[in-house]
Amino acid sequence: MASFKRNYLYQVLYEILAIVLPLITAPYISRVMGAENLGIFSYSHSVANLFLMIARLGIVNHGSRSVAACQKDSENLNRVFSEIFSIQAVFGLLVTTVYMVYIALFVKENQFIFFLQSIFVITALFDIGWLFMGLENFKKTVTRNIVVKLVSLFSIFAFVHDRGDLGIYTIISTGSMLLGHLTLWLGLNKVVKFVKPSLLGIWNQLKGCFVMFIPTIAVTIYTVIDKVLLGGLAGETQVGYYDQASKLVAVPLGFITSFGAVMLPRMSAMEAEGTHGNEGIAITKKSLVFMVALATAISFGLASVSETLIPVYYGKEFLACIPILMLISVKLPFMAWANVIRTQCLIPKHRDKEYIISLFVGAAVNVVLNALLIPKFMAMGAAIATFSTEATVCLVQTIFARDVIPFKKPLLHCMGFILIGAIMYAVVYVLSRTLTFGAVLNLCIEIGVGGLLFIILAVAFYCGVVEKCSPKKLIKQLLKK
C-alpha cells in the first residue's frame, strides 16, 4: 500500500504550484481581460461544467472507491476498469453531442466562446484520473497536473495580450486540461488491461455510478448554479467579481480536497479489508483537527489581508471583491470538517444515502438563498448563500456520522484553533491600518506576521492541549513516514 504521507506530499507539491501560478497569471488576466470578459468566460464555463457533470456521471468517486477495493487483484481490476470506462466513453460522447446541439439552438450571445468550452466537456471522455486515485498512484496525477499548469502558464503570457483574446484564453484554459487527461493514457497498458466487459457488469457499475451521480448533482447546484443565477439576475460583471473572489479561496482549498482525495482510497481499501474499525476512527479524529487547523489558518488569513490583497492582486477595478472574499473565505473550516467526514466515513462505508441527503439539503438551502438574496445584494448575496450552504452540509453530515465518530473531543480542539485564527485576524487587521509602506510590502508583512503568530499559537495549543507533547516530538511525528 502506497505511503499516505508521500501521496499527500505529492498533492501538496501540486497545490503549491497551483498557488504560485495564479499569483503570476491572475493579476495579468484580470487587467488584460477586464471584469466583463472574465464574466463571459466564467458564465460560459459554468454552463459547460453542468454538461461535464452529467458526462462524468459520478464516475470519479465510484471509480476511485471501486478500484481501491480491488487494487491488489489484477484480474478484478481489469474487469472493473473496463466496465467503468465503457460507461464513461458512451456518456462522454452522448453529452458532448447534446452540448453542441444546445449551443446551436439556445445560445445567442457569445456563441463562439460557448463552442470553445466544448473542449472542456470533451475532457470527460479521457479523464481516467479515478483509476490512479484508486490505485493510490498520486505521483502520476500530480505530474500530469504540473505539466498542464506550466503549459497553460506559458501559453497565457505568449498568446493573450488584450481583451480581444478571450477566445484564445478559453482555448488555453480548456485545451490544457484536455492535454493533461491525455497524458494519463501514456503507458496505461502497464497498469491495467482493457477486457471485454459483460452487460451485467456494466449494469452493476452503472448503478453504482448513478448513486454517486446524485450527490454530484447536488454539489454542482451549489458550486455552479450560483454563477448561473448571478449571471442571469445581476449581470456578468457581478459574476466576474464573485468568480475572482472564489478563485482566491479555491486555490488554498486544494489543500483540503487533496487530503480527501488521498484518504478516500486509503479508507475504502481499509473498509474492504475489514481493518477500518478503531484504527479508522482514530485516523479520522486526528484528520478533523489537522484539517480544521489548516483551513482556519487559510480562512482567517485570507480575510485579514483581503483589503490589501485585492488591489495588489487584481487591480482597483476589482475592489468590490473585498467583502465577497472576506465572507466566503470563512466557509473553509466547515468544508474541511465535512470533507474529512465524507471521505473517511460516509463514502468508504457505503453510507451513500446519508451522503446524498446532506448534499441535497445544502443544495436546497443554496437555491433558496440565492434566489432571495442575489436580486438585492448581487454578488454578496451569492457569497452569503455559499457560506450558509457549506455550514449546512457540514452540520448534516456531522449528525449522520455521529454514531461512528465521537465528535466531542475533536470539536473542542477545533474550536481552540478557530479562536487562534480569530486572534490572528484581529492582529493583522490592526496591523494593516498602521503600516505605511507600499502595498506589496504591506501585504508581505501582514502575511508574515499573521502566519508566524498562528504557527506559534497553534503549536503551543497542540503540544499543550491536543496531544500534550513537546514541539520536538511533534516535528518527529510530522516527518515520520
Predicted features, each with a name:
Residues 3-60, 153, 173, 210-237, ...:
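Signature of the first transmembrane helix
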Residues 4, 139-142, 166-173, 182-223, ...:
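Interhelical loop/hinge segments that connect adjacent transmembrane helices in multipass membrane
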Residues 118, 143-190, 208, 249, ...:
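Hydrophobic alpha-helical transmembrane segments
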Residues 27, 56-72, 245, 249-288, ...:
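Helix-loop junctions and terminal segments of transmembrane helices
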Residues 121-145, 330-361:
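Membrane-interface junctions at transmembrane-helix termini in multi-pass inner-membrane proteins
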Residues 103-120, 302-333:
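Interfacial segments at transmembrane-helix termini and the short loops linking adjacent helices
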Residues 27-28, 39-56, 211, 226-228, ...:
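Alpha-helical transmembrane segments of polytopic membrane transporters and translocases
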Residues 429-481:
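Membrane-proximal transmembrane or re-entrant/amphipathic helices at the cytosolic face
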